[in-house]
């Protein structure tokens, strides 16, 4: 009956792989970004706990969705006056430099206007 110990080892290995996969792929809650933020261009960015956002600045009013995975946020505009070349998602690493300060570093984005706005320092309003 060599099969039984081998099956136990195989099941234990599969179980450990499953547990490890669950632990490493779970997205982070959007908590660190939730709030209303403003930058030096006068943009006001409201990020909600449900993964939606709203941006109002002197030129545009845009809304959409965002997801957070670790320290990376992916932004997808879904409506409003979107600039040319800004239909696709943008990905940025974020860092809370203090309770009321937030900075972003470009990971990937084709939208020049969004890059210019997002990569400025943001302060809680």
Predicted regions and their residues:
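Bacterial N-terminal signal peptides that target proteins for export
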Residues: 2-11
């Amino acid at each position: 009956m060599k099969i039984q110990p081998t099956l136990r080892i195989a099941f234990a290995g599969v179980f450990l792989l499953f547990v490890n996969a669950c632990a490493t792929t779970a997205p982070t809650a959007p908590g660190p970004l939730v709030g209303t933020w403003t930058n030096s261009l006068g943009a006001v960015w409201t990020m909600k706990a449900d993964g939606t956002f709203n941006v109002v600045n002197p030129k545009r009013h845009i809304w959409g969705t965002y997801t957070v995975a670790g320290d990376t946020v992916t932004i997808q505009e879904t409506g409003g006056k979107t600039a040319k070349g800004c239909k696709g998602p943008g990905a940025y690493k974020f860092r809370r430099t203090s309770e009321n300060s937030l900075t972003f570093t470009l990971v990937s984005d084709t939208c020049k206007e969004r890059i210019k706005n997002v990569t400025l320092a943001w302060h809680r309003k």
